[in-house]
Amino acid sequence: MALRVYNTLTRQQEHFQPWEHGHVRLYGCGPTVYNYPHLGNLRAYVFQDTVRRTLHFLGYRVTYVMNITDVGHLESDADSGEDKLVRSAQAHGHSVLQVAAHYRAAFFRDTALLGIEEPSIVCNASDCIQDMIAFIEQLLARGHAYCAGGNVYFDVRSFPSYESFGSAAVEDVQEGEDAARARVAHDTHKRDARDFVLWFTRSKFVRHALTWDSPWGRGYPGWHIGCSAMSMKFLGPRCDIHIGGVDHIRVHHRNERAQCEAITGAPWVRYWLHHEFLLMQLQKRAVHADMGSSVVSSFSKMSKSCGQFLTLSSLQERGFQPADFRFFLLSGQYRTQLAFSWDALKTARAARRSFVRRVARVVDAARATTGSVRGTSAECAAERVCESRASESELLLTDFRAALEDDFSTPRALSALQKLVRDTSVPPSLCVSALQVADTVLGLGIIQEATASLSAQVPAGDTLPQRPLPSEEWIGQLVRARAHARQTRDFPRADEIRRQLKAEGIELEDTHLGTIWKRV
């Protein structure tokens, strides 16, 4: 069986075949760094990481590009609302680039804790402004863009297949798109309400924090042009896989595709993969006619703008490990909405600990028969398999591989490993070799944790991964941000910062001379 993926473009599962044999060009939508990543955001990056790891496992060479949006992302995908970075900078009393750098670092701290490997190339939008300007100039030259009211717009009518992408892919977001279109319909400079801005001049925001010189006046890029320009800069005119959330299909990704294919005149992305939302359990008290009341639970998409979200530090404060959350995510199919609750996470933690305990027993048995269990990195795992019965190990992973080749079915892949660990007919050393290879895909550190639990004589599943201590500069930035939040009476934000620092082992004490901190 070869890899099959569900392609949003065709709305069906297809055999995967990259443009270039053996080499996959992968682009993943990265974060807009105006706040801490919430758990729903992190689901996206665990999935991107899983796709990349799976492709490596299947023998592909992967060039993985991820953007960092630090300019031009408005509150609505359809050119309306405030700039998210500017609003965050104003709230914190810092420059846009300072805020972006802070939250960029926070993003990569969280992804590292989750075992997410860094992309081959990480590109900041603010570093690629000239590439965006050159891209817009090409669109204008080809008749796909026009200048009006000081801005440059993409002319949707010039690209006949614009509506064909995502037209029936996600009906649930239709209402949101229609609302966004309605908000910008009054823009009299647009020839069509669907047209979108490629370059804003000061006609949009008179005192925008970040502006650059351009042929159309000093201004800044729209959000959609950034991803197109960065993808084509680092991956070339063709991309094999583009990954993003279902909420971006109908506007952002549709616009990206239109921009790129208007330039090249040829298909741009071969396979579009879209992951579903992580839902958050909300509870509220309902008052009944008889004056009684009850607690009503519901699930809703995590949203920073609505204040409905949890961060990774929120989980750590409750005693969960990042690996518990990664295991929870891998237990769900990426194209299915996943409901997060504390009970669900407890169940995932129990399942992961049980699995690690079983693996620890297998590792112990392998030690007894071979004397040691060798390296645990992807390279050592591959070396070990090559040295000892590689074909047998590959055979043990037949079901695991088949699950991943079926549109990255991680729930089935986990089930296959559970079955392997319980199979007493498999020699322990061979089982460990197979598990080492499998974990280069799952990224759970199962063998490392099982081995550490045996060495440290602590319960398997309870060992914590090593992580670097936070720098004094980073701590100082957060302490100052918390002080500003308290001054502006943004107490929820101040509490969030305290919790984040506590999760990193930093204790705060507020005194009449200011806030002091110490490591605990």
From Swiss-Prot:
CDD domains: CysRS_core. It catalyses: tRNA(Cys) + L-cysteine + ATP = L-cysteinyl-tRNA(Cys) + AMP + diphosphate. The keyword Membrane does not apply. Keywords: Aminoacyl-tRNA synthetase, ATP-binding, Cytoplasm, Ligase, Metal-binding, Nucleotide-binding, Protein biosynthesis, Zinc. It is found in: Cytoplasm. Zn(2+) binds at residues 29, 227, 252, 256. It is an enzyme of class 6 (ligase). Its EC number is 6.1.1.16. SUPFAM superfamilies: Anticodon-binding domain of a subclass of class I aminoacyl-tRNA synthetases, Nucleotidylyl transferase. Binds 1 zinc ion per subunit. Its main location: cytoplasm. Belongs to the class-I aminoacyl-tRNA synthetase family. This is Cysteine--tRNA ligase. It comes from Treponema pallidum (strain Nichols).
